[in-house]
Amino acid sequence: MVQNISSPQAKPELGKLSPEHICPNCGHQGLHIFYEVRNVPVHSCLMMPSQEEAINFPCGDLVLGFCDHCGFITNVEFDSKWSAYAPNYEDQQSFSPTFNKFARDLANNLVAKYDLHNKDIIEIGCSKGDFLILLCELGNNRGVGIDPSVVPGRVESEAADRVTFIQEYYSASHAKYVGDFICCRHTLEHIQPTAEFVSTVRQSIGERKDTAFFLEIPNNTRVLQDLAFEDIYYEHCSYFSPGALARVFRASGFEVTDLYLAYDDQYLLIEAKPVDTTSDKIYPLEETVAQVAEDVKHFTRNIQTKLDNWRLNLQKWKAENQRVVVWGSGSKCVAFLTTLDTIDKIEYVVDINPHRHGKFIPGVGKQIMSPEFLKDYQPDKIIVMNSIYCDEIQQMLQQMGVSTELVPL
């Protein structure tokens, strides 16, 4: 249960060096502890059927450690026993027109770039299968999706009979599923032994040097520079800047063929090919470890002010009896409410995903409402968990006759 959460603590400069912790990304001994939030839900997207179950959801501690050898950041208190991804894990984003356009544009680019026509495609961490099925539709491809939370049949498509879903965690036992193209989107940040994971993919590919590997994760440079505390939560135990990601790929036997940002710089994307010996090529986006250290210092110096400002605003709106709603019930919402310890300041949370409606948010206990709920509620303010969706939200509100102020994070 989330209660009496200690205030997040940002340590001076790089934070205290913790010599007992080993970086899972490069093996270096010693991490600098620079940010702590205690007693947060260990999952953000497991949908709870009742408020009681949601309130009594297990909690853990979030303690970020920075590696001054490779630039990687990890939650040193992360315990993999809580990695209970299952069909009730609901992170499907394809109900958003904005996200759909991004996914379709990305898929079209990959199909064109790698000539993905009549090919075998593997997706590690495929969620409900939206992106894998899209790739198979666009290029008449065959697909295998590996994810413990997959729900076969959730996505209707003419390509469904060409896609096989395996409801398991990816491991070396899946080496036979390699194909012509491997993709992995928003999965690596949930895995703490990151070097081991990337190496497992490389070993699975073996000598098939034409197999490309595409991976997409959150861009931690933006998180640090923008003080995006809502993107720091227990499920995400691994945080990558572009340089840290490229370095672990090279160390695992991949040549980086492209490295870039997308989705308003929120996402970090990497493309790679297996090689015996990597080159010395460095991409412009790659920062040095010293630059990551400066971003960490910026975060520690300024995060408390941002958190205090949000607390003051929420308290002020509550005192004024303003109706304040959160739009977006996923991980950002859970991090926002629990980090600030202001669950009581928000009455309702809405979400566009119909599979979330009526369910309860883990650790928070709020029931998730559909956007149509706002027609009657008529909120004074809507706090938007991701500003990239403001335009589509405003359009929906106008169609529903809801006049309110959008407050993006």
Tell me the role of every PLM-derived stretch:
Residues 5, 9-95, 260:
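N-terminal juxtadomain amphipathic helix
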Residues 42-45, 213-238, 242-246:
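Short, glycine-/aromatic-enriched active-site segment of Class I SAM-dependent methyltransferases
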Residues 55-155, 167, 233, 238, ...:
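Extended interfacial segments that mediate partner engagement and assembly in macromolecular machines
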Residues 195-212:
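A short glycine-rich, Lys/Arg-flanked "PGG" loop and its adjoining helix->strand segment in the class I
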